[in-house]
Curated annotation (Swiss-Prot):
This is Cyclic nucleotide-gated channel alpha-4. 3',5'-cyclic GMP binds at G414, S417, R430, T431. Residues 61-70, 136-140, 191-213 are extracellular. The chain crosses the membrane at residues 39-60, 71-91, 117-135, 141-159, 167-190, 214-248, 249-273. Residues 231-234 are annotated as: Selectivity filter. Residues 274-350 are annotated as: C-linker. The lineage of its organism: Eukaryota, Metazoa, Chordata, Craniata, Vertebrata. The gene is CNGA4. Pore-forming subunit of the olfactory cyclic nucleotide-gated channel. Operates in the cilia of olfactory sensory neurons where chemical stimulation of the odorant is converted to an electrical signal. Mediates odorant-induced cAMP-dependent Ca(2+) influx triggering neuron depolarization. The rise of intracellular Ca(2+) levels potentiates the olfactory response by activating Ca(2+)-dependent Cl(-) channels, but it also serves as a negative feedback signal to desensitize the channel for rapid adaptation to odorants. A motif (IQ-type) lies at residues 292-302.
Length: 575
């Protein structure tokens, strides 16, 4: 009995996770670990693409460092093998959800071309060393099949880097170097096949002083290949068929390479210009407009300086257009991370709901003011409030010179004018002149945007009005009597509105009752009309009466029976 109980307990307990499952978790293809592993795979792939072909074409390089090459070869093979293990533990997206089932991941991977290429790149071709010797690195050319991992790593880096255009240029230069490197190796191998020093085109005889060194051999071949592929010329003419074929192939490669380089560089420059146009407004159109309208030189200079300040200091005025392609929630998170700290410093917005602040940051409009420019003047109607992000603003007198105070970064003004506070003695008018001392970056929040957001947060609106009232009390800008009068007027208006609503409800009820009575009367009238029509159809026509008189009276019993049946049937009722 105890044994059975023990067996059942063992079967019902869940299996313990294996160590392999803990050590090899499923990687997210868009995560950091997978990204850094791709960057690690760049080294063995680049090693094989650059060093392997060089060892195959330069025997001195292969023979001089054989032990080092064998160590590096099998280290790269180990990384190739680990890369396949990583591929078996890299999830994939299915309907937007990351699949972490290792069985499904493995079955999906083995059905792709990547699996066969990875497997072919690890074929143990080195076993032929037993027959041909270790100085035949061409047996390892199948390692080139892992090159797609290099391209994938470059694509991921281009997406993540903060300087994508610079990375594209660096990647293009790397491709150019690899092509010239391969071509120089093939040139040296062809020269050795044809015979060193046989003519002016091939590599000189290594027996000559200075040409026997490995460094000289590679640099000469690289220089010769650069001259050919850049179509600079100044190279000895070919003398044999093999040399002609090599030159023709290089010229065709140079034409395609030149077109590729020009296209890539044009694309990079165009993308840079497009990005600048998206971030900063186009000043050429404004300059042309000012010239056509004969704007005075001083004002034109101020406009040009404003545009120059934006571009030099990387200021942006159209953040909404830049982030318009992001989903709404993601755009809100970006705006919150950038502007929430600034908005939370405003006194009337403190202790407000986080969701309210997230809605407000989407409404902030960045503005840049140049030196001496007025942000607002006394007596202007206040339709927005301002938050100082960077720079200094002065509260000046009407003469524009006398300064009463200086506002710095993090301060704000105009917040009272966008909140309808009862008893506000200044109303929605500006009470001071605000002028920018230098270039100032501000955030603008309009009354309409605030009203739109607060319509969904009535409690927050009440809290903000209370805070604004406290601020006005401290500033002695609140008329308590006027506030009480406005409150009484509002209550009276609301009472009248409630009365009108009640009267409207009563009228609607009476109208519905009258409409029902009208429909009932119409139904009764229709029934009576239908009954009259039925009765008129039963009456005999005058011609029928005359014929009946000529033929004689009908039998008395029959006539009475028919009249009785007609009176009993009656007219048909309404359907």
């Amino acid at each position: 009995m105890s044994q059975d109980t023990k067996v059942k307990t063992t079967e019902s307990s869940p299996p313990a996770p294996s160590k392999a499952r803990k050590l090899l978790p499923v990687l997210d293809p868009s995560g950091d670990y997978y990204y850094w592993w791709l960057n690690t795979m760049v080294f063995p792939v680049m090693y094989n693409l650059i060093i392997l072909v060089c060892r195959a074409c330069f025997p001195d390089l292969q023979h001089g460092y054989l032990v080092a090459w064998l160590v590096l070869d099998y280290t790269s093979d180990l990384l190739y093998l680990l890369d396949m293990v990583v591929r078996f533990h890299t999830g994939f997206l299915e309907q937007g959800i990351l699949v972490v089932d290792k069985g499904r991941i493995s079955s999906r991977y083995v059905r792709t071309w990547s699996f066969f290429l990875d497997l072919a790149s690890l074929m143990p071709t080195d076993v032929v060393y037993v027959r041909l010797g270790p100085h035949t690195p061409t047996l390892r050319l199948n390692r080139f099949l892992r090159a797609p991992r290099l391209f994938e790593a470059f694509d991921r880096t281009e997406t993540r880097t903060a300087y994508p255009n610079a990375f594209r240029i660096a990647k293009l230069m790397l491709y150019i170097f690899v092509v010239i490197h391969w071509n120089s190796c093939l040139y040296f191998a062809l020269s050795r096949y044809l015979g060193f020093g046989r003519d002016a085109w091939v590599y000189p005889d290594p027996a000559q002083p200075g040409f026997e060194r490995l460094r000289r051999q590679y640099l000469y071949s690289f220089y010769f290949s650069t001259l050919i592929l850049t179509t600079v010329g100044d190279t000895p003419p070919p003398a044999r068929e093999e040399e002609y074929l090599f030159m023709v192939g290089d010229f065709l490669l140079a034409v395609m390479g030149f077109a590729t380089i020009m296209g890539s560089m044009s694309s990079v420059i165009y993308n840079m210009n497009t990005a600048d146009a998206a971030f900063y407004p186009d000043h050429a159109l404004v300059k042309k407009y000012m010239k056509l309208q004969h704007v005075n030189r001083k004002l034109e200079r101020r406009v040009i300086d404003w545009y120059q300040h934006l571009q030099i200091n990387k200021k942006m005025t159209n953040e909404v257009a830049i982030l318009q392609h992001l989903p709404e929630r993601l755009r809100a998170e970006v705006a919150v991370s950038v502007h929430l700290s600034t908005l939370s410093r405003v006194q009337i917005f403190q202790n407000c709901e986080a969701s309210l602040l997230e809605e407000l940051v989407l409404k902030l409009q960045p503005q840049t003011y140049s030196p001496g420019e007025y942000v607002c003047r006394k007596g202007d109607i206040g339709q927005e409030m301002y938050i100082i992000r960077e720079g200094q603003l002065a509260v000046v007198a009407d003469d524009g010179i006398t300064q009463y105070a200086v506002l710095g970064a993090g301060l704000y003004f105009g917040e009272i004018s966008i909140i309808n506070i009862k008893g506000n003695m200044s109303g929605n008018r500006r009470t001071a002149n605000i002028k920018s001392l230098g270039y100032s970056d501000l955030f603008c929040l309009s009354k309409e945007d605030l009203r739109e957001v607060l319509s969904e947060y009535p409690q927050a609106q009440t809290i903000m009005e209370e805070k604004g009232r406290e601020i006005l009390l401290k500033m002695n800008k609140l008329d308590v009597n006027a506030e009480a009068a406005e409150i009484a007027l509002q209550e009276a208006t609301e009472s009248r509105l409630r009365g009108l609503d009640q009267q409207l409800d009563d009228l609607q009820t009476k109208f519905a009752r009258l409409l029902a009575e009208l429909e009932s009367s119409a139904l009764k009238i229709a029934y009576r009309i239908e009954r009259l029509e039925w009765q008129t159809r039963e009456w005999p026509m005058p011609e029928d009466l005359a014929e009946a008189d000529d033929e004689g009276e009908p039998e008395e019993g029959t006539s009475k029976d028919e009249e009785g049946r007609a009176s009993q049937e009656g007219p048909p009722g309404p359907e």
